[in-house]
């Protein structure tokens, strides 16, 4: 199987299905990445340990601090105690919260992170009244990447009216 085909199948698997953890699996949050395809994670109970990334995810899926994973325990591991079995994206997290499979300790963390991101990405503009509630959750741009290395230019309505009049 070529590298492109492998990548296509791995990405399709990660983005496509909604997985519920089994009895042995755990939902964990990534704290840091010390390297060599190892990630330090924290469970809902506060236990910290290392997890390894299987070779099918390497160079295909990137994991960053704050992401959530489903891991399988490794019995013989001393430092590395689990292996990543699934990477959870925001849609998976919402689905697990709705189904009641999400740990309470992480629900507080996700709400706090969402509030922090909204404060960072939303410029402080005067509040405008909402239009007739036609906006759906699919139009929510709060999870889009914002490049912080670029200046944010905000054009006011007064400036645009002056330009149109000239």
From Swiss-Prot:
Where in this protein does the record say Phosphothreonine is found?
33
GO cellular component terms given for this protein: nucleus
The protein's location, in the record's own words, is:
Nucleus
Q: Phosphoserine modification sites? A: 132, 136-138, 156, 160
Motif Nuclear localization signal: chain residues: 6-12, 56-65
User: Where do the segments described as Disordered lie?
Assistant: 99-166
Q: Which CDD domains match?
A: S1_eIF1AD_like
Instruction: Write out the biased-composition intervals (Acidic residues).
Output: 156-166
Pfam families attached here?
eIF-1a
Q: Where is the composition biased (Basic and acidic residues)?
A: 110-119
Keywords assigned by UniProt, alphabetized: Nucleus, Phosphoprotein, RNA-binding
UniProt-recorded Gene Ontology molecular function terms: RNA binding; translation initiation factor activity
* Residues covered by the S1-like domain: 5-89
Which regions span the lipid bilayer? none
Q: What does this protein do?
A: Plays a role into cellular response to oxidative stress. Decreases cell proliferation.
Q: Quaternary structure?
A: Interacts with GAPDH and STAT1.
In terms of PANTHER family, this protein maps to: RNA-BINDING PROTEIN EIF1AD-RELATED, TRANSLATION INITIATION FACTOR-RELATED
The UniProt similarity line reads: Belongs to the EIF1AD family.
What is the protein name given in its UniProt record? Probable RNA-binding protein EIF1AD
Give the originating organism. Answer: Bos taurus
Give the classification, highest ranks. Answer: Eukaryota, Metazoa, Chordata, Craniata, Vertebrata
Q: Which gene is transcribed and translated to give this protein? A: EIF1AD
């Amino acid at each position: 199987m070529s590298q492109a085909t492998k990548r296509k199948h791995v990405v399709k698997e990660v983005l496509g299905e909604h997985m519920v953890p089994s009895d042995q699996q755990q939902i964990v949050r990534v704290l840091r990445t010390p390297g060599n395809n190892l990630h330090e994670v924290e469970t809902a109970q506060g236990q910290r340990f290392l997890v390894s990334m299987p070779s099918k995810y390497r160079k295909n899926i990137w994991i960053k601090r704050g992401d959530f994973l489903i891991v399988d325990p490794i019995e013989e591991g001393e430092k590395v105690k689990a292996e990543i079995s699934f990477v959870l994206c925001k849609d998976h997290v919402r689905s697990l919260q709705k189904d009641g499979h999400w740990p309470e300790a992480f629900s507080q963390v996700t709400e706090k992170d969402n509030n922090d991101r909204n404060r960072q990405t939303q410029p402080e503009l005067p509040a405008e009244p909402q239009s007739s509630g036609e906006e759906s959750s699919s139009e929510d741009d709060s999870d889009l990447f914002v490049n912080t290395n670029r200046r944010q230019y905000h054009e006011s309505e007064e400036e645009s009216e002056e330009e149109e009049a000239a």
